[in-house]
């Protein structure tokens, strides 16, 4: 089932006012983002159906009138419920399965944010008389430092990418040789441009322009941005595109990066590929073996090289510079180290 069909199925089983909300506010967002909101709101409706409106038989039977009856206390209880709850679904083989679900503070906040967005929409469009979610505080999040790849880790990764013949054997070597140039092009594009994994897999052949040494990506929200390529990125993409011309069984002629099945690579397939190489390089930190680690490494390298944070924000596709400052400026350890090393602790004291 395609993602578009998956989204349609979700919306079909939700009330009309949620369909309208997603259609109006999130049409420009990626399908994955829209599906995420649908899942969050479905969990909220399932909670209301179980504890607040037991007479509602199907989720699609909920109305704006029901939302107008929701109290702040209901949202507070839903917030507590999200810490640990049971969900029941029908498996592909027709069996009824019950699972215990748990959410971190981040997961709880994300779901509350989805509910807040819905109630804000209903209030602004005069479909409810009060937005009770304004009274609810989000969980306080403690920021955790997720480090970029070190220079040594980056070099080990690149060594395996370019010289995998020394590291892989048997069928793993066969697989490596078959996708070597594609994988190199993906890694170097990440490290050299900092694009998001979704932006990378959505690239088409026609998005690449070697005359201008750039390519076009569709950022979050649907805006297009021209990304200029470092020489290494341009060279590896050119080699891959030349090799791609000789590949057999391509089913998606537009897609830049092709899977072994001849289809456009998915976010999941790129994640698995990156994890495979990180494992081979001895990188066991799960936060460093995800695509975002390469994006983080790109941003941190720019900051350590003294690139202005406004330029870094633009290159990262951040509309708000505060996002760049919050999530990446903290990693500029070189500058912090220099400041601390030059502090005269004792002054003139002998």
Task: Please place each PLM-identified region on the residue numbering.
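Conserved catalytic core of the tyrosine transesterase superfamily
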Residues: 1-350
């Amino acid at each position: 089932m395609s993602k578009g069909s998956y989204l349609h199925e979700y919306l079909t089983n939700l009330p009309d006012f949620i369909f309208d909300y997603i259609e109006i506010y999130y049409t420009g967002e990626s399908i994955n983002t829209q599906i995420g909101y649908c899942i969050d709101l479905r969990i909220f409706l399932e909670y209301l159906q179980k504890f607040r409106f037991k007479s509602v038989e199907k989720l699609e039977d909920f109305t704006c009138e029901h939302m107008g009856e929701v109290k702040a206390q209901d949202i507070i209880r839903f917030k507590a419920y999200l810490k640990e709850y049971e969900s029941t679904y029908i498996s592909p083989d027709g069996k009824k399965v019950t699972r215990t679900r748990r959410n971190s503070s981040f997961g709880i906040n994300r779901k509350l944010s989805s509910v807040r967005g819905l109630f804000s929409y209903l209030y602004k469009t005069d479909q409810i008389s009060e937005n009770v979610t304004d009274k609810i505080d989000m969980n306080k999040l403690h920021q955790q430092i997720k480090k970029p790849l070190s220079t040594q880790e980056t070099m080990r990764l690149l060594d395996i990418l370019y010289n995998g013949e020394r590291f892989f054997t048997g069928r793993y070597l066969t697989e490596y040789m078959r996708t070597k140039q594609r994988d190199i092009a993906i890694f170097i594009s990440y490290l050299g441009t900092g694009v998001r994994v979704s932006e990378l897999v959505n690239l088409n052949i026609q998005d690449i322009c070697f005359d201008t040494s750039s390519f076009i990506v569709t950022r979050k929200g649907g805006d297009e941005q021209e990304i200029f390529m470092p020489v290494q990125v341009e060279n590896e993409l050119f080699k891959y595109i030349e090799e791609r011309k000789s590949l057999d069984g391509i089913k998606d002629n537009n897609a830049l990066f092709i899977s072994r099945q001849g289809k456009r690579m998915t976010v999941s397939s790129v994640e698995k590929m990156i994890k495979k190489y990180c494992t081979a390089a001895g990188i066991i930190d799960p936060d460093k073996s995800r695509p975002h680690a390469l994006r983080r490494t790109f941003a941190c390298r720019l900051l350590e090289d003294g690139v202005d944070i406004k330029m870094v924000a633009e290159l990262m596709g951040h509309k708000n510079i505060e996002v760049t400052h919050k999530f990446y400026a903290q990693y500029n350890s070189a500058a912090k180290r220099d400041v601390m090393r030059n502090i005269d602790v004792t002054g003139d004291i002998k």
